[in-house]
Amino acid sequence: MKIAEIKELATKELQERLDAEVAAYDQMRINHAVSPLDSPAKLKHQRRMIAQMKTVLRQRELNK
């Protein structure tokens, strides 16, 4: 998901997607600890996605 797509989402929908991404990231970390992932770069991508979502939410909060 690109930053432009993230900005188009409604705040409530963005928060729901963020919660889902955080849960998926936690699950990926657990799975990676047990047996290595095919591509550890997926963890980096997931962290970046979460950071972008949090950034957009914070920008909206400050602009109110």
Curated annotation (Swiss-Prot):
Keywords: Ribonucleoprotein, Ribosomal protein. InterPro entries: Ribosomal_uL29, Ribosomal_uL29_sf. GO terms for cellular component: ribonucleoprotein complex; ribosome. GO terms for biological process: translation. The keyword Amino-acid biosynthesis does not apply. It comes from the Bacteria. The keyword Ribonucleoprotein applies. GO terms for molecular function: structural constituent of ribosome. This is Large ribosomal subunit protein uL29. It comes from Porphyromonas gingivalis (strain ATCC BAA-308 / W83). The lineage of its organism: Bacteria, Pseudomonadati, Bacteroidota, Bacteroidia, Bacteroidales.
